[in-house]
Swiss-Prot record:
Its cofactor is [2Fe-2S] cluster; Mg(2+). Belongs to the IlvD/Edd family. It comes from Shewanella putrefaciens (strain CN-32 / ATCC BAA-453). Binds 1 [2Fe-2S] cluster per subunit. This cluster acts as a Lewis acid cofactor. This is Dihydroxy-acid dehydratase. It is an enzyme of class 4 (lyase).
Length: 619
């Protein structure tokens, strides 16, 4: 029987000092011997997805203590990618993922916690906590802050739904009046919560459901809705169930590495492809798999992308649906149910929502709205928006008049009526990206599935933005932004501003963009990121020159620089001849702090999840 980890600091006379300190935090005589459950919160007033999380730790703690545990809360940092975007702040976003993972590990191991509840929400916080949870391998439950309500406003007497991307595009579009731009800006992000489309934050919170580490509704229940309160309470109760199963019954199925195994990672990626999730999820799943010692690679993602249909289309891929609409259609469990009926899901995997002895199949039987007989579950998925601006959680209790069970023309489709039989993400490879790159096909217009154009090369995102807004980029160009990978940036910046500005100049369907950086979950269009190897690691993207012909063929999963092998080799030799300046951007001026330099020294390319190069840390 496993011994409580916390016994290390609570048992024996030699731990009298540690017990004295525990007592100073409120622990009583009869508490010693109970499991200590760490609550990793990520409250901050900088981020709308986290601004309402201040009291959530106390809510989870109340359920833990009622179930017989000791709850101790700590906080992590949280970077808002939207606020950090478009300037040097974005260099810190991806590196913050590793910092969050390390900080959770530090706190949990330093204090010998027995189990963990992760309160996350936005872009790098959920992945960072996920990496930590799989690294620690103690019982864990994830519960997120929930999505923001979609914005709504009237333009030309027509009511439209909005999100963050609409504000960015309108702000850069000279054809939009100052009045309309301001109106969109004020309406785009009306409430607390993670941005309202299928962007990175919501994608990752959905994937924790598919991995088996969070409760049904975690990815789709609105941050403002009163029903979300129960998710926090149940997370506290459920982590105690898992802790007792492991420490009292020696049941290792309660551990995250046995829940999030290879099959679960396949389920998560299947969901991601089916719902057209953010391309960043590929990066984060690859990183999490390494922490879990699961051999899940780009090759698996490529294989699955050819098999899984696109069953759920959400903003930014369409203005019609946002996360509140996904929830009304049954949320993640609704999509997983359709994937199961299509024979594309492993249902024999463990899940934190399953009763002892149960698995994902039993969870779907209860929570898939197309098969459940539970009226409470149906009521749960009818939770809707109030349309009232607020920063407060649980502030409203509005309901849709009915569920969206239309699997032919609704938000979630059956395989027969899929938005497309090709999934929402694809892995491309070729001499531009020998180790692969990612495109969110859900956001690509059918006319652009094949594209041939001339390279317009930029050594940084800043130069690309200036070039796009300055009229350098014209229809038919392939914008190449390099030296923005994990090592070369450093930090692998998101390229939402370049893609948004292409749209604002009417070039969204007339140009392609490729980069060793990454894209916001809000990106759509022919935007190809995660090019691996990156330029700073000797990738071919560093050898592309202005005017080169680049051929993109998504159906054939290829991306090619159309020059001879002899010419490519000559360019490589010329690059190597630059000596210490080889594989570095020419003429770029950028301040890189010591913290970012330390990150860059260990960073791998995107095909490895941009995690640390462990070979550099081995004895």
């Amino acid at each position: 029987m496993p011994k409580l980890r916390s016994a290390t600091s609570t048992e024996g006379r030699n731990m009298a000092g540690a017990r004295a300190l525990w007592r100073a935090t409120g622990v009583k005589d009869n508490d010693f011997g109970k499991p200590i459950i760490a609550i990793a919160n990520s409250f901050t007033q900088f981020v709308p997805g986290h601004v309402h999380l201040k009291d959530m730790g106390s809510l989870v703690a109340s359920a833990i203590e009622e179930a017989g545990g000791i709850a101790k809360e700590f906080n992590t940092i949280a970077v808002d990618d939207g606020i950090a975007m478009g300037h040097g702040g974005m260099l810190y976003s991806l590196p913050s993922r590793e910092l969050i993972a390390d900080s959770v590990e530090y706190m949990v191991n330093a204090h010998c916690a027995d189990a963990l509840v992760c309160i996350s929400n936005c872009d790098k916080i959920t992945p960072g906590m996920l990496m930590a949870a799989l690294r620690l391998n103690i019982p864990v439950v994830f519960v997120s802050g929930g999505p923001m309500e979609a914005g709504k406003t009237k333009l030309s007497d027509k009511l439209i739904k909005l999100d963050l991307v609409d504000a960015m595009v309108a702000g850069a579009d000279s054809n939009v009046s100052d009045e309309d731009s301001a109106k969109i800006e004020r309406s785009a992000c009306p409430t607390c919560g993670s941005c309202s489309g299928m962007f990175t934050a919501n994608s990752m919170n959905c994937l924790t459901e598919a991995l088996g580490l969070s409760l049904p509704g975690n990815g789709s229940m609105l941050a403002t809705h009163a029903d979300r309160r129960e998710l926090f309470l149940e997370a506290g109760r459920r982590v105690m169930v898992l802790a007792k199963r492991y420490y009292h019954q020696d049941d290792e199925s309660a551990l995250p590495r046995n829940i999030a195994n290879f099959k679960a990672f396949e389920n998560a990626m299947t969901l991601d492809i089916a719902m057209g999730g953010s391309s960043n999820t590929v990066l984060h799943l690859l990183a999490a798999a390494q922490e879990a010692d699961v051999d899940f690679t780009m090759a698996d993602i490529d294989r699955m992308s050819r098999l899984v249909p696109h069953l759920c289309k959400v903003a930014p891929s369409t203005p019609k649906y946002h996360m509140e609409d996904v929830h009304r259609a049954g949320g993640v469990m609704g999509i997983l149910g359709e994937l199961d009926r299509a024979g594309l899901l492993h249902t024999d995997v463990f899940h934190v929502a399953a009763d002892e002895g149960g698995n994902l199949k039993s969870v779907l039987a209860k929570y898939d709205v197309m098969q459940t007989q539970d009226e409470k579950v149906k009521h749960f998925f009818m939770a809707g928006p109030a349309g009232i601006p607020t920063t407060k959680a649980f502030s409203q209790d509005c309901r849709w008049p009915s569920l969206d069970n239309d699997r032919q023309e609704g938000c979630i489709r059956s395989r027969e009526f899929a938005f497309s039989q090709e999934g929402g993400l694809a892995v491309l490879s070729g001499n531009v990206a020998e180790n692969g790159c990612i495109v969110k096909t859900a956001g690509v217009d059918e006319s652009n599935l094949t594209f041939v154009g001339s390279a317009r090369v930029y050594e940084s995102q800043d130069d690309a933005v200036a070039g796009i807004l300055g009229g350098e980029v014209v229809a038919g160009d392939v914008v190449v932004i390099r030296y923005e990978g994990p090592k070369g940036g450093p930090g692998m910046q998101e390229m939402l501003y370049p893609t948004s500005y292409l749209k604002s100049r009417g070039l969204g369907k007339a140009c392609a963009l490729i980069t060793d950086g990454r894209f916001s979950g809000g990106t759509s269009g022919l935007s190809i990121g995660h090019v691996s190897p990156e330029a700073a690691a000797g990738g071919t993207i560093a050898l592309i020159e202005n005017g080169d012909r680049i051929e993109i063929d998504i159906p054939k999963r290829s991306i090619k620089l159309a020059i001879s092998d002899a010419e490519l080799n000559a360019r490589r030799e010329a690059m190597l001849a630059r000596g210490p300046m080889a594989w570095k951007p020419i003429g770029r001026e950028r301040y890189v702090s010591l913290a970012l330099k330390a990150y860059a020294m260990l960073a791998t390319s995107a095909d490895k999840g941009a995690v640390r190069d462990r070979s550099k840390l081995e004895d």
